[in-house]
Regions:
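Class I S-adenosyl-L-methionine-dependent methyltransferase catalytic core
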Residues: 1-287
């Protein structure tokens, strides 16, 4: 087992694991930025690369680079079996603060999003939120969908699941994205998500249903009335508390590469206190 932590917490983690499992030496804690230490960790696990592997990616904010997720996906690819299963936590407050109505908070936040997604394919979503086309909920759904789309279509995962966790006030706290090639893993996670007292993002579920309906209409040559998508999405929203797997839909392609940062303070994303409560972050996304 490989664990990743910053230097201070890393030492405490070593102490806790050693106390809990004094006779077990099958673990190692790697200090520092996981984006930099992952290659060393994977090299240390080379002898067990044949084994099914699970990675829990739990960042504070939006620090994990797409190159890190890609490295995990590639690690067992030549084994012609399943890739590393990834369970990735996407913090909703982080998305709300960096990607809210006021837009990306300066050039450094834009660069952090480039690193998070591995490209600037997030730009149409930012533009939609900026011009009022997307609500805060729709923005979150689109960003999570983009991440899932890339996991399946860029990295080749067969299935992804997305589950939104909310607090007692009903405000989003984070979304858990699970990516797998394993039918048993798919079945187990689908069952766990369905059994949890949680819900899939209603906005995402509805948009996926409408996107599939659009594809069927396009294949049949049927015309659609302009401006009706949001009405269809509202009508398609499911019952809160239920989980139904929906595949990601094709994200909006980048057409206009202009990034409007007028009036935006150039805030370093590492200076944002991500542990503020979700309700405050949600308010930021609506302002």
């Amino acid at each position: 087992m490989a664990f990743f932590e910053l230097p201070g917490p890393a030492q405490r983690l070593r102490t806790d694991i050693a106390a809990a499992r004094p006779n077990d030496q099958r673990w190692q804690v790697f200090e520092g930025d996981c984006n930099q230490s992952l290659p060393t960790a994977l090299a240390s696990l080379e002898e067990v690369r044949w084994a099914p592997t699970f990675a829990f990616v739990d960042p504070r904010g939006v620090q994990v680079a797409w190159t890190t997720v890609t490295a995990l996906a590639d690690w067992r690819r030549d084994k012609k079996k399943t890739k590393v299963e990834q369970w990735i936590l996407m913090p909703e407050p982080a998305l709300a603060r960096v990607l809210g109505l006021r837009g990306v908070h300066g050039r450094r936040s834009a660069e952090r999003l480039d690193r998070l997604f591995g490209s600037r394919d997030w730009l149409p979503i930012h533009q939609g939120r900026r011009n009022g086309t997307l609500t805060a909920d729709a923005m979150r759904a689109e960003f999570v969908n983009l991440y899932r789309w890339q996991l399946e279509n860029h990295l080749g995962y067969q299935t992804t699941h997305a589950l939104q966790i909310v607090n007692t006030a009903g405000h989003p706290v984070y979304t858990l994205i699970f990516a797998t090639d394993s039918p048993p893993g798919d079945a187990i996670m689908g069952h766990l998500y369905g059994s949890a007292v949680t819900s899939m993002i209603p906005e995402m579920q509805a948009r996926a249903q409408v996107a599939r309906q659009h594809r069927r209409e396009d294949e049949s040559g049927l015309a659609r009335l302009p401006g009706m998508d949001e009405f269809a999405i509202e009508a398609a929203k499911g019952t809160p508390g239920s989980y139904q797997h929906q595949p990601p839909w094709r994200p909006t392609p980048v057409v206009d590469e202009a990034l409007d940062l007028e009036g935006e303070p150039d805030i370093d994303p590492d200076d944002i206190y991500w542990d503020d409560d979700a309700e405050a972050a949600d308010d930021d996304s609506r302002s």
